[in-house]
Amino acid sequence: MLNPYEIMETIRMIEEEKLDIRTITMGISLRDCAHPSGEVARKNIYDKILRYAGNLVEVARDIELEYGIPIINKRIAVTPISLVAESSSEEDFIKFAETLDKAAGEVGVDFIGGFSALVHKGFTTGDKKLINSIPRALANTERVCSSINVATTRAGINMEAVSRMGKIIKKTARETRDKGGLGCAKLVVFANVPEDNPFMAGAFHGIGEPECVINVGISGPGAVKAALKKVKGQKFDTVAETIKKTAFKITRAGQLVAREASKRLNVPFGIVDLSLAPTPAVGDSVAEILEEMGLESCGAPGTTAALALLNDAVKKGGTMASSHVGGLSGAFIPVSEDAGMIKAVKRGSLNLEKLEAMTCVCSVGLDMIAVPGSTKADTISAVIADEVAIGVINNKTTAVRIIPVPGKDVGDEVEFGGLLGTAPVMDVSKFSSSAFIGRGGRIPAPIHSLKN
């Protein structure tokens, strides 16, 4: 039973510690929109998105006002467009991306995800068309996000896809060079991608999902940091217990919003994603939580252990607070979106190699990392290969969202604005991986993938 102290504590978390609901994401199946005529398929897509999501933003605002819990983003995730558009005879899928963008603008959401393909074992014709369309699709749209799954623990790593995505990322940066390569901030390459992720840029509506669903992503690094301030100097047992209790309260807020949105929109509730999602705002940082545990600067020795503790404790506390947990559900470490991470990079305590180590124990992977515009496509592909290998071997989701910023070099900065923040350009190894990436083929699945 709730007591008055807990109610006041939750109010304080919202007012002073930047607790919010990061996103309400509506997943919509577009499988029945496929048609041999691209024009008909696009009309079907547009009409269906408006039919289901027409009231999403209004309902989210009503809940926000009624309960006093800020809901930062309203988003849509759709069936991977490579599946929906494949039956059309069109040579590229750019117009499909523009249709998604138009529909998203009409209903008023911040982003729409699902310009996606699943190619962990190989490419279909539709997959190839979609991947080749990504650079111009992201350059021509404002709200569309793209994701490609190149590996799974059960299938291994499709190195042909890894190689191709390095080139696509470079081309996307060139196509959006007037905005600092912004298109790459809306493009993510996955291993073991979840089908119910509410966060961008990796959200899409999986083929095992219902016709329509509501998924919610929480936030609240500031609330966790504030709680840890009260146990300064105490043992890690106490630290873990404190994070668990705070995560429970944060997730309860997410569960409340998800259930209420589901009821008002007459759409099934899917999952709450337990990921601690930072913002560029001061005091809303995952890096600062790690430093509160006793690290001088994020990236110092001990950072990976601190992050492992945080990630595990958030899951334990959050799982108790929601009937259905899913998505990515862990701590995010996006460099440009976390004020503490940005400071750590500038201080020199955090580099690409340390971030890769940290991704072994947390959610997602190398996220929102800016590198010099001169970085070769093969090097980007090799970074992707390293990161997805961590996911495949450890049976977890990993991903890469990397921005080779045109015209920028190590030490420069690029400003993306809003939740995407500011990215310091980080150093990448100058040694070549071209011969390695040039081999192609597939890296086989690990032996422990054979579970049956």
From Swiss-Prot:
Homodimer. InterPro entries: UPF0210. It holds the Pfam family DUF711. Belongs to the UPF0210 family. This is UPF0210 protein Hore_14430. PANTHER family: UPF0210 PROTEIN MJ1665, UPF0210 PROTEIN SPR0218. It comes from Halothermothrix orenii (strain H 168 / OCM 544 / DSM 9562). Gene3D superfamilies: 3.20.70.20.
